[in-house]
Curated annotation (Swiss-Prot):
SUPFAM superfamilies assigned: Ribosomal protein S8 (SSF56047)
Function comment: One of the primary rRNA binding proteins, it binds directly to 16S rRNA central domain where it helps coordinate assembly of the platform of the 30S subunit.
GO biological process, alphabetically ordered: translation
UniProt-recorded name of the protein: Small ribosomal subunit protein uS8
Gene: rpsH
Gene Ontology molecular function, alphabetical: rRNA binding; structural constituent of ribosome
Subunit structure: Part of the 30S ribosomal subunit. Contacts proteins S5 and S12.
InterPro entries reported for this sequence: Ribosomal_uS8, Ribosomal_uS8_CS, Ribosomal_uS8_sf
Superkingdom to which the source organism belongs: Bacteria
Keyword Ribonucleoprotein: yes
Bilayer-spanning residue ranges: none
Gene3D superfamilies with a match to the protein in the record: 3.30.1370.30, 3.30.1490.10
Amino acid sequence: MINDLVSDALTRIRNAGMRRLDVTTLVHSKSVEALANILVEKGYIESCNVVEDGVKKTINVVLKYSDNGKSVINEMKRISKPGRRVYKGKDEIKRFKNGYGTIIVSTSHGVLPNDKAYALGVGGEVMCTVW
C-alpha cells in the first residue's frame, strides 16, 4: 500500500523521464490530479487525463522532452512529507531558481503554483519543487 501518493507520483514521473518513456500512469487522488494539472500548465509535461476502470481511477501523463531528447524536468523534489510537514508564508514562496523553477503549494484556495499563491497573498504547505 502506498502511504504518500504525491511522492509516488513524483517518483513515477522522474523515473519515466530517465527511461525516456512517452507515457506513465499515476495513482489517482485529488492532490495528484491538481499537481499534474499544474505541471501541464507550467509546461513540464505535455498532458494528463483521468482514466476510470470501474471503481479504480488512474492518471495517464504524457511526458515532454526537449529537442535533444532530454526530459524538460531537471529535478522534482518532495519538500513536505508525512513525517515532517513544511509550511511557508506568502513572502517565502515568491521565487524559486530565479523564476525558472516552480514551488507547488497546497493552500486554502487549493493546490497552486508559487506565482499564483503569491498573487493571492496566501501561503501553505509546500508539496514539492520542480525545475
